[in-house]
C-alpha cells in the first residue's frame, strides 16, 4: 500500500521501494539460492532508523505538510477505531445538512458522549461533497444543535478539529458565517457539560475555533493550529506563497510552541512517521488521552468548568 511519501521523506521512500522490490522477487521465486529475507530485515531496520532521524528534526512547514497528508486519519476514522455504537445526527434544522461537519452520539468505554468534528473526504467526489472540510454556517449551527442536545442529556462533548478554515464563499457569508462562528464561541463557553477538543490535522482559524472552545484542548504531535495558513500569511507579508515555509516557522503553528504559549493542554504523540502510518495505534493513544481528560473534568463542578473555559477563551491573544 502506498504511503504517499512527502518531499522530505524521499530518502525513506527510496529505501521502502528497495524493500518492496526484494519482497516481490522473493515471492515470485521461492527457490532462489540467496537469502533475501536477511537483506529485507536489514533494510527495514535502516528505514526505521532513518525515519527516526528525519522526524526528530522536523520544521514547522514539514509538520504542516504532515497535518495535510492525504492518508491522515479523519474524524470518522477515529470514531470507528476509538468509539462504539456511533449514531450520526444530521442537519441544522434551519437550512441544510453540511457534510463538512459530522456529529452524533457514541460510547467511549461504555459512556455516552457527543462527537462533533470536521470531515474532509478522501476521493474526489467525497471531497467535493464535504467541501474539503470547510464548513458553511449550517455546519456550525448543526454543531451547536448537537452541543445543546448533549447538554440536555448531560453527555460530555468531544470535538475533532481538522479544517483549512470556514468556507469563505459568498453564499456562506450571506447566510451568516461570522455570526454562526461567533455564536458557537459564546455558547460553547457557557455549556454545563465537559468539552474536550483535539486538533487532529489542520486547525485553521475561526473555522477551527468554532468547535474548539473546551475545558481541555489537545493537539496531535504533527497537527497545526493557526489564524491563517502559512501560504496565506506569506501572500500577505511577502506577496508570494513561495515564502510559506518561512511563514510557518514565524507563526508558531506547531504543538510544542502552542503548549509553551498555554493555548493547548496536551500533545498526543503520533506513531513513527505520523498518524497515517498506524491509525490504530494513533486511535489508541487518542482514546487514552480522552479518558484521562474526562476523569480530570468529572471532579469539577459545573461552575468551575464554565469559569475555567471562559477564562481560557478570554486569555487568547495575551502574552
UniProtKB/Swiss-Prot annotation:
InterPro entries: Acetyl_CoA_COase_a_su (IPR001095), ClpP/crotonase-like_dom_sf (IPR029045), COA_CT_C (IPR011763)
One GO biological process term: fatty acid biosynthetic process
Occurrences of domain CoA carboxyltransferase C-terminal (ranges): 35-296
Main location: cytoplasm
Gene3D superfamilies: 2-enoyl-CoA Hydratase, Chain A, domain 1
Molecular function, one GO term: acetyl-CoA carboxylase activity
Reactions mediated catalytically: N(6)-carboxybiotinyl-L-lysyl-[protein] + acetyl-CoA = N(6)-biotinyl-L-lysyl-[protein] + malonyl-CoA
Its EC number(s): 2.1.3.15
Disulfide topology: none
Keyword DNA-binding found: no
Keywords: ATP-binding, Cytoplasm, Fatty acid biosynthesis, Fatty acid metabolism, Lipid biosynthesis, Lipid metabolism, Nucleotide-binding, Transferase
Function, as annotated: Component of the acetyl coenzyme A carboxylase (ACC) complex. First, biotin carboxylase catalyzes the carboxylation of biotin on its carrier protein (BCCP) and then the CO(2) group is transferred by the carboxyltransferase to acetyl-CoA to form malonyl-CoA.
Subunit description: Acetyl-CoA carboxylase is a heterohexamer composed of biotin carboxyl carrier protein (AccB), biotin carboxylase (AccC) and two subunits each of ACCase subunit alpha (AccA) and ACCase subunit beta (AccD).
Protein name according to UniProt: Acetyl-coenzyme A carboxylase carboxyl transferase subunit alpha
